[in-house]
């Protein structure tokens, strides 16, 4: 094994473990017919998106930057949820996401108009 740098923090991803987890996720999908989305807030290592996209159906994004990341690097379905959608940024949100979650009646009104 190659020596790992110890002078700075880093993430070490184990492809075998990711693949094993994806196999379990596929079993759940096959047994239930459900759709499984990845929350970019929890895991946004776009370098492994091609591997994840073989099993996962898409992503959820809670910021415009996450929505853009999903659109650019993760094929499939994209869902957005945010405490606040700004009128200025919302047209860009619609370029990146197919559906949106509203967190208040005011957001429902905003999203419908």
Walk through the language-model features, giving the residues of each.
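Generic N-terminal amphipathic, Lys/Arg-enriched alpha-helix
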Residues: 1-12
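Residue-level detector of functional hotspots within protein domains
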Residues: 4, 22, 64
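Active-site-proximal beta-alpha core segment in soluble small-molecule metabolic enzymes
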Residues: 10, 34-113
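A short, N-terminal amphipathic alpha-helix
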Residues: 21-31, 48, 69
């Amino acid at each position: 094994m190659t020596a790992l740098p110890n002078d700075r923090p880093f993430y070490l991803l184990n492809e075998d473990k990711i693949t094993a987890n994806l196999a379990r996720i596929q079993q759940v999908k096959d047994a239930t017919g459900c759709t499984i989305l990845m929350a970019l807030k929890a895991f946004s290592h776009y370098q492994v998106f091609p591997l994840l996209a073989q099993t996962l159906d898409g992503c959820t994004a809670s910021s415009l930057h996450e929505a853009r990341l999903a659109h650019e690097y993760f094929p499939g379905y994209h869902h957005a949820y945010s405490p606040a959608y700004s009128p200025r940024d919302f047209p860009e949100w619609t370029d990146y996401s197919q559906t949106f979650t509203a967190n208040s009646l005011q957001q429902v009104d905003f999203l419908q108009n």
